[in-house]
Amino acid sequence: MAVANDYIVKDIGLADYGRKEISIAETEMPGLMSTRAEYGASQPLKGAKIAGSLHMTIQTAVLIETLKALGADIRWVSCNIYSTQDHAAAAIAAAGIPVFAVKGETLTEYWDYTSKLFDWHDGGMPNMILDDGGDATMFVHLGLRAENGDTAFLDKPESEEEEVFFALLKKKLAEKPKGWFAGLADSIKGVSEETTTGVHRLYNLAKEGKLLFPAINVNDSVTKSKFDNLYGCKESLVDGIRRGTDVMMAGKVAMVAGFGDVGKGSAASLRNAGCRVLVSEIDPICALQAAMEGYEVVTMEDAAPRADIFVTATGNKDIITIEHMRAMKDRAIVCNIGHFDNEIQVAGLKNLKWQNIKPQVDEIEFADGHRIILLSEGRLVNLGNATGHPSFVMSASFTNQTLAQIELWTNPGKYERQVYTLPKALDEKVAALHLEKIGVKLSKLRPDQAAYIGVSQTGPFKPEHYRY
C-alpha cells in the first residue's frame, strides 16, 4: 500500500496503467468531455472544495478530472470497501489529487478515509459534498448531532458498520475542538447525491427538518435512473457473477428481489444470459410490470429451494434471511446489487464455516453440510467482483453530477435546506450530449407541430410528471 501525506492507494506504480484506461474511458464519456469544453473557460467551480465519496473507478476518475477542469479543488474516497479500481486511484493520486481508496480496505480504514475528506490539506474545510450512498453526508449530520450533546446513539450501533462508524465519530469528537462539526456543517453549501439509498437518507432528513444544507437528488434524473440503474445493471450484473464464479448462466433459475429500475436491469441481464428468472416484489404495480414482462413473480420463500442464483436489488434490509439461505440448494450463488450489504443477512453467517475461494468470493457451509457461494460479502457484486457499469452509461450519470455541483455552487441563495432535482431541460441536455456518439439522428419539431402539442421546439418536450 502506498501511503503519502495526501493520498492512500494500493500501489502508486499502477498510475500509468490507470492513465491509459482513463484515456480510453474519455472517448466513451461524451457528456463529461462536452461539459469540459463548454464550461472549462468560465471555471464555474472555482473556489469549490468538493469532498467526493463515490466508487473510485476509471469512470469516476474522468468525473474527478472534469470537476478539476472546471476549477474545483477535490478530495476523494470510495463509497464501498470493494469497489475501488486500484489503478484508477493511483492515476488520480499521481495527478496530484488527494485520494484515499484501496480495493478490499477494512471498515475501519473505510471510515478513517472518509474522515480525511473533511481534513482539508490547507487546514480549511470542504464547502461541497458529492456523495454516493450518503456516508459523507451522514458523517457531518451525525457528527454535529453528537457534538450538540445527543450522544446516546453512539453507544447503540445496530451493525458492524455502525459500530466502526460511531467509534470514529467518538474519536473525532475527542480530537477536534468544540464547534468543529458545527463549522463543517456551516461550510457545506450543498450536496449532490448519486444513488437511491443516499436519496432516501436525504428525504428522511428533510422530512424531519434536520437537513443541514441543500441537496440535489441526481439519482432521480431520468438520464441517471433510467440509464445507469437500468442499462448499466443490464450489462454489469452478469459480468460480476461470471467473473466471480465462472458459472454457466444459461438454463439456471435466477431470483431477483425487487423490480425497480435496478431490478428491471438485473432481471433483463439474467434473462439475456439464458436464465429462467423469478422476481419478488412488495409493490403491486412493479409486480404487475414483472409479470407482464414474462417473469414469474413469487416470494423469497417460494424461490429459496428453487433458484440457483439470487440477486437482491431492493434498497431494503433483511431481504434474504438466514432461513432463506438454509433452504437453498447446495452452492447456490447469493449476491446483492443494492448499495448496502444488509439486504442479505450476512452478519448472521459469521459463526458458520467460511472458506475464501478468491477475493470477494466465499463459500459458507451450514450445519447440515450444504453450502452457499456469497459474492462480495453481500456488497455491490458488479463493483466488487467486476468493474461496474460501462463508461458510456456512467457519462450520463456523472454529467448530471457535474451540473448539480455547478448549480449548487453558483446559485447558493436559490436553494433552501430541501432536496431538489435537476430541471427537465438539463435532463434532456444530458441525453442530447450522448446521441452523436452512438449515431442517433434526432428529429426536429416544426413550429406548427410544437404549437400543436404545446411545447417549445427546443424542449423541454415532456412535463415534469411524465414517466419515462
From Swiss-Prot:
Its cofactor is NAD(+). GO terms for cellular component: cytosol. Keywords: Cytoplasm, Hydrolase, NAD, One-carbon metabolism. Its EC number is 3.13.2.1. It catalyses: S-adenosyl-L-homocysteine + H2O = L-homocysteine + adenosine. SUPFAM superfamilies: Formate/glycerate dehydrogenase catalytic domain-like, NAD(P)-binding Rossmann-fold domains. It is found in: Cytoplasm. Substrate binds at residues 57, 132, 194, 224, 228. One of its GO terms (molecular function) is adenosylhomocysteinase activity. The keyword Manganese does not apply. The keyword Flavoprotein does not apply. NAD(+) binds at residues 195-197, 229, 258-263, 281, 316, 337-339, 382. Pathway: Amino-acid biosynthesis; L-homocysteine biosynthesis; L-homocysteine from S-adenosyl-L-homocysteine: step 1/1. InterPro entries: Adenosylhomocyst_ase-like_sf (IPR042172), Adenosylhomocysteinase-like (IPR000043), Ado_hCys_hydrolase_NAD-bd (IPR015878), NAD(P)-bd_dom_sf (IPR036291), S-Ado-L-homoCys_hydrolase_CS (IPR020082). GO terms for biological process: L-homocysteine biosynthetic process; one-carbon metabolic process; S-adenosylmethionine cycle. It is an enzyme of class 3 (hydrolase). Pfam families: AdoHcyase (PF05221), AdoHcyase_NAD (PF00670). Binds 1 NAD(+) per subunit. May play a key role in the regulation of the intracellular concentration of adenosylhomocysteine. Belongs to the adenosylhomocysteinase family. HAMAP family: AdoHcyase (MF_00563). PANTHER family: ADENOSYLHOMOCYSTEINASE. NCBIfam families: ahcY, PRK05476.2-3. This is Adenosylhomocysteinase.
